Amino acid sequence: MKIEAIDVTLVDVPASRPIQMSFTTVQKQSYAIVQIRAGGLVGIGEGSSVGGPTWSSECAETIKVIIETYLAPLLIGKDATNLRELQHLMERAVTGNYSAKAAIDVALHDLKARSLNLPLSDLIGGAIQQGIPIAWTLASGDTQRDIAIAEEMIERRRHNRFKIKLGVRSPADDLRHIEKIIERVGDRAAVRVDINQAWDENTASVWIPRLEAAGVELVEQPVARSNFDALRRLSADNGVAILADESLSSLASAFELARHHCVDAFSLKLCNMGGVANTLKVAAIAEASGIASYGGTMLDSSIGTAAALHVYATLPTMPFECELLGPWVLADTLTQTQLEIKDFEIRLPSGPGLGVDIDPDKLRHFTRAG
């Protein structure tokens, strides 16, 4: 089954609500949607970065250029089912650009799984779990509004784990914000925080113990992505788990973080690692090192979320579960059906490949003009 065509479409999907982070406020999310055609089938994937190039060195625009200029010409005509060879060719041809590679890699996995009439999770070994508890991000910036959202999510049995974005306000104001939320919902929900690199080590060393005392169970990326030494000291000095997100940007970074036990958990993201196989390698590094795997998101659409869910469902343990909330923070979905959240878990979709199909009308509607 030879690759006949690789199409890349830029889409911009509005957020259903502003998402306030330490470095930007996300009003919309842009994606490079990939469709690979072979043997009468189409495999789909996507590449993106939260808020554009402010979070990483890639964005939807660079992903499209890298694929169309370098990766697509290299892969067209090759055997679509030889996933290892295709990954090797991409690695040799392009340095970094992991989200571009992941978009291709996921589409190829989807294509092969569809050709075998298998779910993606079966293609890579089989799902251990059919649903994963899913956290919701509270990022309105308003304490009372965040409390109301948390109460609603618990009542509807959608989420009882909440990640709260910090770093825009002062640490003291952030702590008061956290304490008020935990006071209201802490007996019914777990609370973790994401600082998105906003603090230096001294600030983190003062305020992380106070967050732990307030009832926070997990602290994500408190310091700059490159400051592995600070992460190691903070992890050693605090009982609350420290989660690497921005710091986990390659297989090499995973090895270094694990070798020095800099953190307690890895935030897995297919787009950070270059696709399915490398994400599973990072999870294996984590497991061998006593580090927890956490199901991260790049605010993926239902396409990227389905792919990640299939991968995460094959992992034996995920103590802090996942945050695959992307499809529900967007104003609309790009697929014909929405993924399901039931009893606080996101459910693994059935059907071949990713288990979701692009809605052509919605794809056209959100395609960027020009």
Swiss-Prot record:
Gene Ontology terms describing biological process: amino acid catabolic process
Which controlled-vocabulary keywords does the entry list? Answer: Aromatic hydrocarbons catabolism, Isomerase, Manganese, Metal-binding, Plasmid
The record lists Mn(2+) as bound by: D194, E220, D245
Coiled-coil residues are none
This protein's pathway reads: Aromatic compound metabolism; 3-chlorocatechol degradation
A Pfam family (short name) is MR_MLE_N
- Gene Ontology MF terms: chloromuconate cycloisomerase activity; manganese ion binding; muconate cycloisomerase activity
Question: EC number(s)?
Answer: 5.5.1.7
Highest rank taxon of the organism: Bacteria
Q: Which residues form the signal peptide?
A: none
- Keyword flag Manganese: yes
Q: Which SMART domains match?
A: MR_MLE
Q: What's the catalysed reaction? A: 2-[(2R)-2-chloro-2,5-dihydro-5-oxofuryl]acetate = 3-chloro-cis,cis-muconate + H(+)
Q: Which cofactor does it need?
A: Mn(2+)
- Which residue positions are annotated as catalytic? K165, E323
Q: SUPFAM superfamilies, per this entry?
A: Enolase C-terminal domain-like (SSF51604), Enolase N-terminal domain-like (SSF54826)
Give the family this protein belongs to, as stated in its UniProt record.
Belongs to the mandelate racemase/muconate lactonizing enzyme family.
Q: What does this protein do?
A: Highly active toward chlorinated substrates but retains diminished activity toward the non-chlorinated substrates.
What is the recorded name of this protein? Chloromuconate cycloisomerase
* Organism of this sequence: Pseudomonas putida (Arthrobacter siderocapsulatus)
